[in-house]
Amino acid sequence: MENYLLSSPTQLSQPYDDGTNSLLFMDNYELSQNLSQPLDQHLQSLQQQSQVQSQAPQQVQSLNQHQQLPQIQPFPTLVNNQQYAQETFQQLSQQHQQQQQQQQQFSPFQQSQLQQQFQYQYSQQQQQQHFQQPVTIEEEIVPASNNTNIQISKFFDDNKGDDEDIANSGNFNEFDHSRNISLDDTTITDLHRRENSINPPTGLPHSISSNTIYSYSSFESPQSHIQSQPSYSQGYHNQNSLSTPLRRNKSYSISSANFNQSPVNLATTAMNKIMKTPLRGHTRSRSKVDVNAAVTAAMNLGQATKSNSTSSYNSTLNPFYTPSQQLSSTDDDDISTPLLTPGTKLHTSKSTFFSPYNKDDLEDQDDDAVKQLRKAKSYTSLLRKKKREDMTPSKQNQQHQQQQQQQQQQQQSRQSGGGHIQNLSFPNSTSQPKIDLLAYDQNPMTSYPPMDKSILKNLNQSISPFNKPKLSPPPSNFPSISIDLTTIATNKSSSFSSSTTHRNYNENTPFNSANSTSGGLLPPMATFTVPTVIKEELQVHNLQEEEQEHQDEQMEIDSFESNEKNARPTLSTSSLVRSMKMANLEISNDQQMSSNEDENIVTEAVVKQEKNGPVVDDVNGTGTNSKKPRKKQKSKSKENCNKKGKVATGNGKDNDKNNECLVNKGNKTNNNDTSNDKLDNDNKNTNGNGNNDNDNDSEENNDNVDDADDDDDGTVTIPIPEDLNVTKVKVRNNRSKSNDKSDPKKKHKCPICESRFQRPEHVKRHLKSHSSEKPFECQMPNCGKRFNRKDNLKAHLKKIHGLVKGQEEFTRVLNENKEVS
């Protein structure tokens, strides 16, 4: 039962239109009885088939026969069917003449509708009789979709044109059977009522076969009977296609009878052109169906559905989906557009507008900023590489320089083995390449090997990246020795540079700030420990040279001593070395001086030191001398200077004035000497981290020397009190030094920081700032702050605690501080 013709899912999804004229005279039963003539010949064929079936099994008629109309497969041979056929044949023969007269009265549209209605009524009667009869096993109910009589030969016949196929398919497009029809209705009058269309059938199972979507072979062409064509052999080829307005057209269905055929060929030939009603204005013509996997799968399953633009199902799943079409491909191109298949949509779509997507002759623009930067960098890198190749020496020159360095090092090692080092100047200093500080990171010198990490253990100062301590790895028998590069950079004489380097070896101390900041071109470099054997040899050699220099200088010293009254004792070797170091400190490295000028400076320093008197020096350099006795000695010498100055002004003798000048000069050298002792002791006791302190001390010494020259204009230096514990050499002074020096009223000077004041009381008050003692304490609760001066305490009470002079708390704090002091 389930294989009988029912409405398809796509048909049910279509909107139902009650305003259609498809069932115009459905309720007029008498009128439908008069339209029985189209079944005359059909009933005759049924009688013949029933006789044949009684004798032998019925054979399936060929689908390629063009002489017969589409016929319904015969039902099983039943007695009731034969009797009913005879009765209906007699009734129809009597009414044959009446129908011919009525055909002239109705329009073609009404005739086609009535014929379709009568055909459906006849099929309903046949089905009702069939339900009452038992069905044997051998007898088979053939579904309507399998009984199709669509001429398949036309699909594969290449001789037939497209126009002929369209004309033949017009009869199928005109048919429209009613929807949702209940097959168990007993009366024809109740055929098309609304409740019967909505309610499901009562006697049949609700199953719909997908293979019975549309089948036109069960019904004959109504128009062929209207035109009264005598022969059916002409078939559909002689009939013209009529497009009825306001009717939905059907597409071809591929039923189960066509499964033995190739679905690909069927799709490409039969589906060339599908016509639609002219309800919609625009159209699309399909050239050929794109054969893909989706089409093949749909054809194999037999689920090719009707394509309609008003359907609600997804059109992308159906490869045969097209919008409403009516015009053919021969029409004007302005109103027809080729339908794009999914496979060729991207490849064949070409826009009429300009687009660089498929424009192959466009130039590639370098719009990317990164590409432009890379290109620019590549140009500059080529120039740098070429310049680098020009600047770097060749491998042969490098090997030649290395060989020369090794030979010189071997010669120096042999000389050091003999006990004397005659020349410790920088080896091959003139042949070394210059260091370009700007291009160092990009162009590292190949002649400079990488720094040895073991050197870092003995570093006392930071090493800059261009300050390489080793130019080449020395041989095993010659240890590394620190070299004073500042003396080499100043291009001084070989004798003077060698003497300075010898003293640096002897002292074995890191370069101080005075030595590094005196005009040198390179930053300070770290020194390294020297083995004891080489150190002893250097000491012996240095002592010999110092004795020779001492003999030469002693001759000049004797000439100065002959002019003086009091003979001075000879100086020790250590004092000579220290005096010469002071001379080196005072010489700027920017000045190109000869060896004679250096000797004159050394002799002047020695004369100044001899005039000051014998000095007890610490030869071992243990640094036991403290600051306090040194400054007491300094204050005593200044007191003597002041006393002698007063005597000189009272008596007015020239000899006393000369003595006063000598005393002042002696004080100058004494101050320099004590400051140098302090500087040496600080360098020996520190680990190289106190460079800033040394800088401050050296600047203070220079200031002291400059200020000492102003003693000639009548300034008085106040002596340091004996009970004062001096801990701060340099204190914060808000007064400007230039104003102090230029102001003639300020004739009293501090012996420690050389600050000038108008009165001696001011100097005594100022001296307390150099001491760490703070006798004045604030007695306010939760304060306890101490001050070294009373006026500072007063300012504190006034500013912090808000006490005004004359209040009880203010006076109490001051009185308590007086008692303590």
From Swiss-Prot:
Biased composition range(s): Polar residues: 222-245, 319-329, 422-432
Zinc finger (C2H2-type): 748-770, 776-801
UniProt biased composition (Low complexity): 305-318, 396-412, 662-674, 684-693
Chief location bin: nucleus
The protein's role, per its UniProt record: Transcription factor that acts with ADA2 to promote cell wall integrity. Regulates the expression of target genes in concert with the transcriptional regulators SWI4 and SWI6. Crucial for proper cell cycle dynamics and responses to echinocandins, which inhibit beta-1,3-glucan synthesis. Has distinct transcriptional targets under basal and stress conditions. Also regulates a transcriptional network that influences the response to fluconazole. Plays a key role in adherence, hyphal development, and virulence. Acts as a repressor of hypha-specific genes during yeast-form growth.
Organism annotation: Candida albicans (strain SC5314 / ATCC MYA-2876)
Protein name: Cell wall integrity transcriptional regulator CAS5
Keywords: Cell adhesion, Cytoplasm, Metal-binding, Nucleus, Phosphoprotein, Repeat, Transcription, Transcription regulation, Virulence, Zinc, Zinc-finger
Signal peptide (from-to): none
PTM comment text: Phosphorylation at Ser-769 and probably additional serine residues. GLC7 dephosphorylates CAS5 in response to cell wall stress which leads to its translocation to the nucleus.
